[in-house]
C-alpha cells in the first residue's frame, strides 16, 4: 500500500499566496491528498515589515480562521477523506514568543521558520498596519547586518555579511528557534540560505559542523523538521534540506514532515512522492503529519 499524500505547508492569499482556501482544497482533492495543513505566514511586528503584504494582518486573523472553517466544511463535502489542519508558518526572531503565542492562538500546527537574521527592532511596538505603527523604527536597514535572507529584491544582508556569515547566523537563529519555548511543531525548510547558492552566494566554509549542530538541536529539543519540495521550484533546483543535512537528521532520529510550500493551488502536493523517495534514500522509514486536533499520525514510507 502506497504512502498517503500529505502536504504540511501551504499558503493562501491571506498572506503571500495567490489562491483561496477553497482552491487549495480543490487542488488537494484532485491530487488525492490525505492531510493538508494550511500554514499562512503569521502576523509580524511593524519593525520587521512595514507593509502587510506577506503575512496575515492582525486585523484579519479572525476572518482568516472563519475562512478556514468554511473551507473545512467544503472539504467535508467534496473530499471526505481529506483532513484539513489549521496552522501558521511562524517566523522566529529575537523576542517573538509573546507575539506568536497571541497571534497563533488556536493553531493545531505551527511551522517554525527562520527568514530573518539579526536585530528585529522593537518587536513589542505593534503589528504591521495598526494605528501608530508607522512611527515604529524599521529594523533591517542597509548597513545593519540584519534583515531577510530570502528576499531576492533586497540582498543587503548577503552583501554586508557574505555567504559564510549568513549561514553561520542562520544556523544560530535556527537552533534558537528549535530551543524556543514555543515548541514549534516542525521546522520549515531547514537550510533556506541554499536558495541563493546557484546565484553567486554559495558558502565557502564547510557546512558539516553547522549541519551537525542543527541535527543535535532538533534532536535534543524534540522538533520535527520539514522536507520541502519548494527548492525544486527555485534556482537551487533541489529539496530543502540538502541530502547531507537530511542524512544527519535521520541518523539523529529527528522525525520529518513533508510540504510543498505552495503559494498557488497548482503547487499543492507538488513532488510529494519524490520527497518520500528522497527521505527514504536518506534513511527515513516514515513521515509524520499533524491531525486537526494537534496530535501526530505516522505513515510508513
PLM feature spans:
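Extended substrate/RNA-proximal surfaces in nucleic-acid metabolism proteins
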Residues: 58-220
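Active-site-adjacent C-terminal substructures of enzyme catalytic domains
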Residues: 206-260, 264-268, 285
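Non-catalytic positions within long, well-ordered alpha-helices that form the structural scaffold/packing
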Residues: 29, 178-180, 250, 280
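Conserved, mostly hydrophobic/aromatic
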Residues: 9, 28, 110, 189, ...
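Structural preference for beta-strand elements that scaffold enzyme active sites
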Residues: 3-7, 35, 81-87, 108-111, ...
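A short acidic, amphipathic alpha-helical/loop segment
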Residues: 98-100, 244, 274
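An N-terminally biased module of ancient metal coordination in phosphate/nucleic-acid-related enzymes
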Residues: 1-94, 127-130, 136, 193-198, ...
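Mid-to-C-terminal alpha-helical segments outside catalytic/metal-binding sites
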Residues: 267-301
Amino acid at each position: 500500500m502506497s504512502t498517503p499524500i500529505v502536504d504540511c505547508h501551504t499558503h493562501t492569499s491571506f498572506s503571500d499566496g495567490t489562491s483561496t482556501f477553497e482552491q487549495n482544497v480543490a487542488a488537494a482533492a484532485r491530487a488525492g491528498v490525505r492531510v493538508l495543513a494550511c500554514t499562512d505566514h503569521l502576523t509580524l511586528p511593524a519593525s520587521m515589515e512595514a507593509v502587510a503584504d506577506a503575512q496575515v494582518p492582525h486585523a484579519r486573523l479572525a476572518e482568516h480562521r472563519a475562512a478556514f472553517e468554511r473551507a473545512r466544511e467544503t472539504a467535508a463535502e467534496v473530499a471526505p477523506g481529506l483532513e484539513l489542519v489549521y496552522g501558521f508558518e511562524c517566523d522566529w526572531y529575537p523576542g517573538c514568543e509573546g507575539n506568536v503565542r497571541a497571534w497563533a492562538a488556536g493553531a493545531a500546527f505551527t511551522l517554525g521558520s527562520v527568514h530573518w537574521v539579526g536585530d528585529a527592532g522593537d518587536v513589542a511596538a505593534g503589528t504591521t498596519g495598526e494605528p501608530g505603527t508607522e512611527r515604529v523604527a524599521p529594523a533591517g536597514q542597509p548597513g545593519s547586518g540584519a534583515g531577510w535572507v530570502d528576499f531576492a529584491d533586497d540582498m543587503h544582508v548577503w552583501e554586508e555579511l557574505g555567504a559564510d556569515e549568513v549561514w553561520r547566523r542562520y544556523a544560530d537563529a535556527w537552533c534558537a528557534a528549535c530551543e524556543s519555548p514555543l515548541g514549534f511543531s516542525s521546522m520549515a525548510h531547514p537550510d533556506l540560505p541554499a536558495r541563493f547558492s546557484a546565484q553567486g552566494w554559495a558558502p565557502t566554509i564547510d557546512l558539516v559542523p553547522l549541519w551537525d549542530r542543527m541535527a543535535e538541536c532538533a534532536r535534543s529539543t524534540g522538533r520535527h523538521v520539514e522536507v520541502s519540495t519548494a527548492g525544486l521550484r527555485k534556482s537551487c533546483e533541489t529539496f530543502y534540506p540538502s541530502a547531507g543535512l537530511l542524512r544527519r537528521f535521520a541518523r539523529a532520529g529527528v522525525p520529518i514532515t513533508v510540504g510543498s510550500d505552495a503559494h498557488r493551488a497548482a503547487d499543492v502536493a507538488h513532488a510529494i512522492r519524490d520527497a518520500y523517495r528522497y527521505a527514504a534514500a536518506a534513511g527515513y522509514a516514515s513521515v509524520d503529519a499533524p491531525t486537526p486536533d494537534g496530535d501526530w499520525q505516522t505513515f510508513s514510507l
